């Protein structure tokens, strides 16, 4: 590849040459150009695709993107597209799609995804267009989240009045006293067709009673200020962004009285008081301006400080509950679209790598009065299941229990006392784990090549566990429903008991998975709300929260249990 030599020379001269060389995997590309044979086709294809994806990474900075627009790099991308593509049979694609529509097999999904990638980097424009159609129809968003402004405002904890001492210097005088601040914080959604855009707004009042030490008397003052603080927030594909707060304060001060040791002295006391009042009148405009500036500055700093602390907690929870699980299961979260209206913020995501499919069935619509709604397609579970890396593996039950604990719960759980640790499980080479959302339940399917326990062995069996939703107020959880089911040849009583003895411990009857926690029902900020929709159908799990009324029940599938 001539372009590869030019890029190698270009990066050697660049300030970040070593980093670019590693990022673009130039050494790997050089190595693959020096070998031939069909046995290296897949290695070249995988490497070329990885490099092309890296070159179009949306996380690149503007400077990095500009570096990649240089002619040698454009030529390299064009040349390795030939490696990234491959032969495409439309008849084969049609057969895979037809079978996938009826079986939802992960193996068929992977085959369709592979053909899509070949078409994406094909030199044939018609195949490229067909690849885009596949991407649109079979890699649609598989997660949708919508949150209303009302719910965001419910989330904000009530602000208690704050009393604080006043120690300052205003208009050249030392001022001492006490102030009380009352604040109301609201969230205002700002319409935007491409991102989540909202403002934190604080409206507050500061009332103070102070004394200023001036010669020849002490002045007692009252101040009443009102302030507004606005802080712009953005959520886009790169994360959460907070802008500096802006503040404005208005108000006035008034003189309550003059105190002087000479007040009781005839004539002189009056003169002293008049002098003090005149000094106050002259300095009042400057004092009011300084008080306004001080109130605005403190409100602005308080908003930035408190919002910064809360956002740090949000980022930490987001990292713990979203980023880390995605990393554990080798998933990528790609926003398909985001938008904000005055009523709600909506985000559609695709949780999949380039090698995965995503949603391809119609998504349930949320009730129009929903304060929050959430829809999740079964492809999220199935793409995550690949991250378990169980296809074709053979391991004992103790190892399997530890692996599942680490992947799903991030820590090793204590084993059940009667876990058959030594039993060995060999999973199928394809579709070892699959999840289906249908018939009002979530079905977990395990394909087992062999289960061996001591001298006993069972081959070619499918394990089916079903989970149904249970609603209790604002709490929603999935519980295992009924007994485990098995399919396979010659499954008599003995083999079934053996299967129950192993998988009944890994998937216990009382197993529960929280969807919405009970804490929401106990939080007064969410009083008057209920689960208004819970649907599991056609590959989707859909959940909505909205206003509760005495006669209202959740719009749900018939298999939902309510308490």
Stretch-by-stretch model annotation:
Residues 1-157, 271-563:
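Extended, low-charge, aliphatic-rich alpha-helical segments
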Residues 2, 44, 235-257, 414:
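Short charge-dense sequence patches
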Residues 132-199, 204, 211, 533:
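Interfacial loop/beta elements and low-complexity acidic/Ser/Thr-rich segments
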Residues 161-168, 196-200, 206-210, 253-258, ...:
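Generic detector of short, locally flexible boundary/turn motifs and exposed helical patches
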Residues 187-242, 417-418, 423, 431-465:
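N-terminal beta-strand/beta-hairpin edge segment
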Residues 216-218, 260-261, 560-561:
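Short, charged/polar low-complexity linear motifs in solvent-exposed/disordered segments
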Residues 224, 230-239, 244-246, 279-282, ...:
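Amphipathic, rod-like alpha-helical scaffolds used for oligomerization/assembly
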Residues 244-280:
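Short acidic, glycine/tyrosine-flanked loop/strand segments centered on an H-E-D-like triad
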């Amino acid at each position: 590849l001539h372009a590869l030599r030019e890029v190698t020379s270009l990066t050697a001269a660049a300030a970040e040459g070593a980093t670019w060389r590693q990022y673009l995997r130039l050494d790997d590309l050089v190595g693959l150009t020096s070998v031939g044979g069909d046995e290296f086709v897949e290695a070249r294809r995988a490497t070329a695709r990885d490099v092309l994806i890296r070159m179009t990474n949306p996380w690149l900075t503007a400077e990095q993107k500009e570096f990649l627009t240089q002619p040698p790099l454009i030529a390299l991308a064009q040349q390795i597209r030939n490696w990234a593509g491959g032969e495409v049979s439309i008849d084969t694609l049609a057969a895979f799609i037809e079978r996938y529509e009826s079986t939802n097999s992960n193996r068929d999904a992977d085959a369709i995804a592979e053909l899509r990638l070949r078409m994406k980097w094909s030199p044939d424009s018609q195949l490229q267009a067909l690849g885009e159609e596949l991407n649109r129809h079979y890699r649609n968003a598989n997660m949708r989240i919508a949150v209303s402004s009302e719910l965001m405002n419910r989330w904000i904890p009530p602000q208690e009045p704050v009393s604080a001492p006043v120690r300052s210097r205003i208009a050249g005088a030392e001022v001492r006293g006490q102030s009380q601040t009352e604040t109301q914080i609201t969230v205002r959604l700002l319409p935007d067709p491409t991102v989540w855009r909202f403002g934190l707004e604080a409206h507050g009042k500061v009332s103070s009673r102070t004394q200023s030490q001036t010669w020849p008397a002490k002045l007692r003052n009252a101040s009443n200020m009102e302030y507004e603080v606005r802080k712009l927030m953005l959520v886009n594909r790169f994360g959460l962004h907070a802008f500096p707060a802006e503040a404005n304060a208005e108000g006035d001060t008034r003189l309550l009285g003059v105190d002087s040791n000479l007040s009781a002295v005839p004539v002189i006391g009056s003169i002293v008081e008049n002098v003090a009042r005149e000094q106050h009148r002259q300095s009042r405009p400057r004092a009011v301006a300084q008080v306004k500036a001080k109130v605005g500055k403190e409100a602005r700093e308080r908003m930035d400080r408190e919002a910064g602390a809360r956002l740090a907690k949000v980022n930490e929870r987001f990292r713990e509950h979203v980023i880390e699980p995605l990393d554990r299961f080798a998933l990528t979260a790609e926003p398909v679209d985001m938008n904000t209206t005055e009523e709600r913020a909506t985000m559609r995501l695709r949780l999949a790598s380039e090698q995965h499919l995503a949603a391809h069935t119609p998504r349930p619509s949320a009730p129009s009065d929903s304060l929050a709604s959430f829809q999740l397609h079964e492809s999220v579970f199935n793409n995550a299941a690949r991250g378990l890396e169980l296809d074709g593996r053979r391991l004992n039950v103790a190892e399997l229990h530890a692996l599942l604990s680490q992947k799903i719960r991030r820590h090793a759980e204590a084993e059940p006392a009667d876990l058959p640790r030594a039993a060995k499980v060999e999973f199928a080479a394809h579709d070892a784990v699959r999840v289906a959302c249908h018939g009002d339940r979530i079905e977990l399917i395990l394909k087992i090549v062999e289960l061996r326990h001591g001298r006993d062995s069972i081959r070619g069996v499918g394990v089916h566990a079903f989970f149904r939703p249970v609603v209790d107020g604002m709490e929603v959880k999935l519980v295992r429903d009924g007994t485990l089911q098995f399919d396979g040849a010659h499954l008599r009583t003995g083999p079934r008991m053996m299967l129950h003895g192993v998988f009944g411990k890994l998937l216990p009857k009382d197993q529960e998975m929280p969807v919405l926690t009970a804490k929401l029902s106990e939080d007064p900020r969410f009083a008057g709300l209920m689960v208004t929709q819970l649907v599991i159908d056609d590959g989707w799990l859909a959940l909505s929260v909205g206003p509760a009324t005495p006669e209202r029940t959740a719009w749900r599938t018939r298999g939902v249990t309510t308490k």
